[in-house]
Amino acid sequence: MRQPSDHRPDGRIDMANSKVKAVQQLPSERQRDPERTRAEILKVATAEFARVGYSGARVDNITALTRTTKRMIYYYFGGKEQLYVAVLEQAYGDIRAIEQELDLKHLSPVEAMRTLAELTFDYHDKHPEFIRLVADENVHNAEHVRDSEQLGGLNSPILGLIQNILNRGYRDGVFHRRVKAIEVHTLMSALCFYRVSNQATVKAIFGYDMSSPTTRRRQRLFIAEMIPSWLQDPHPGRATK
């Protein structure tokens, strides 16, 4: 008997029929554990998008690296672009969740800012795939980030966290440089991002290996001390209004 086609007369894919087939093709264990299936697809997709970028990634390659089918990727995510947005949302969500787990209230403003800088450094250092994803999304002018309904809400808490530390520092008289939370965040991120994103070129041009354990320890200390010292400067020049 001829099987019904997933394509409508107008040539478009019948997603309802396609989803039914996708579920039917899954092993029974995977039908019972959709969250694990989705998580596995996201894990493989993250590695693939980080490796070759959005333009270079192929759904067929992601399918081949998972124990699932191409139909299931479309079932869970809708398509390559939606899958990429989901990867970005998870990548940003992971670091934001770790930041929110920090208990900084019992620390002095200086120690709190130093601790946040150390965490930011460590996360970037341990997750080069995050660096590559963000760099590639900037190549695409953040078009996929703008398509996400979640990323704005996911990322706003870090500014509140930094602002709280700043407010305590100003109140206690230990921070003198008047800055915005977004300025601290972008400066801290830039210092941690560059040492991972530019390791290869810096080593090739200057012979300076930023990935060596010794250099890593030195740079972690520099960045963790630099941010609080910058805020503590008693002669900061013209303050930000």
Question: What are the residue ranges of the model-derived segments?
Answer:
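C-terminal peripheral helix-coil segments that are non-catalytic and often amphipathic
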Residues: M1-Q25, L119-D122, K126, S156-D172, ...
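Generic hydrophobic, amphipathic alpha-helix propensity
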Residues: T37-A45, I62, V87-A91, I95, ...
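Amphipathic alpha-helical interaction segments
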Residues: E40, E111, T115, L119, ...
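Helix-turn-helix
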Residues: E40, E48-Q82, A86-V87
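Amphipathic alpha-helical linker/stalk segments
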Residues: V87-L116, R146-G153
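All-alpha amphipathic helical-bundle segments outside canonical DNA-binding/catalytic cores
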Residues: E111, D147-L154, R171-L187, T240-K241
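Amphipathic alpha-helical segments used for helix-helix packing
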Residues: A112, D125-E149, Q199-F206
